[in-house]
Amino acid sequence: MNVVFVSGNRTWGGSEELWSATAAVLASDGHRVTVFKSGVDDSEPRIRRLRALSSSIRDLARFPLMPRRLFTLVRSLSSGAAYGHEVVRLLIGLALSRRPDLVVVSQGGNHDGYFLAEVCRRLHLPYAIVSHKASELYWPADWQQKTIAAVYRAARSCFFVSEHNRRLTEEQLGFPLPRAAVVRNPFLVSWEPRTDWPDDRSELRLACVGRLHPKEKGQDLLLRVLARRRWRERPLSVTFYGDGLQRTSLERMAHNLGLAKVTFAGFVSDVAAIWSDQHGLVLPSRCEGMPLVLVEAMLSGRVPIVTDVGGNAEVVDDGITGYLAAAPTEDALDEAMERAWSERHRWREVGAAAAARIRTLIPREPESCFATRLVELASSAKAL
């Protein structure tokens, strides 16, 4: 099979894990794999892995003969020109290449990559859409709606990472998606259950893992809750793992609030190491798809305290395998954390229940399962 993966994300985050891992599985199985991605980082291990498997990787955010730094400047001055350039690059690349059996368009949200899928539709190529997030915070503009609806209707399949995301996308589009399905992301911790538990005699430790982007990830909500008197007085520390454009402002916010037991650890490549020292995950997100870090924390036997957004409630049973905040607000988060604190003697038990539960909801090798589905989809498209 000849399979093409297209990603319009200009950075590397959780939404890049599924397509890249699946592409590696297909390439290892002898399929022809081509990747079109904006902002290819040659130092990224997944990119190096795909190149080692003889996959063709093309950067949509490059202009022939123009230095990368100059093109980056042009893009920063005009995002519209950047999107237009990516469309042209993809259009030419697909038109001049051997006709693919399937194109997989991966987008970080549920409509931010629609213009890339539109290229496939215009070229009459069989394609599938993968959406990694849908949120009430982001609705397509009316002028986009006609094209977005067209690319979803024409897709061979529309994949989402949670049932919530599928349902919300149908609401935003105004029609059902009969060829929609939920897929799982690959995770970066061991499938084998952990039996260790960090020392909890002097204090409890929570990790808040993710991109430092309060609009979506809600770290500001957590800082305000931790600034409340009772949390200041408790033997609880919180470490923020991850980087982002708002790291400095969040650090300043924590300093201004006088939060002495809050630490910013930056990006950590060894995810499993996080859970060697932390007792639980606190995720105050305002929007999500299916947080990879939530799956990883549960696989690691750590207690999750999360807001009821995205697919969180699809894997966390409140009070049994974790704690759900009813909404992404300070009071709701405080209430969920308070319930968790009152049952802190049960955290290891809750973590064990979470570990058992999540293994019934996700496959051991999500990328292999997705690769199989894509081959079946490509085969059916080829037969038409």
Regions found by a protein language model. Name each.
Residues G108, F267, R286:
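Aromatic "clamp/platform" in nucleotide-sugar-dependent glycosyltransferases that forms part
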Residues E251-V268:
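Nucleotide-activated donor-binding/catalytic signature segment of Leloir-type glycosyltransferases, i.e.
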Residues V4, P198-K217, L223-L226:
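Conserved donor-binding/catalytic core segment of Leloir-type glycosyltransferases
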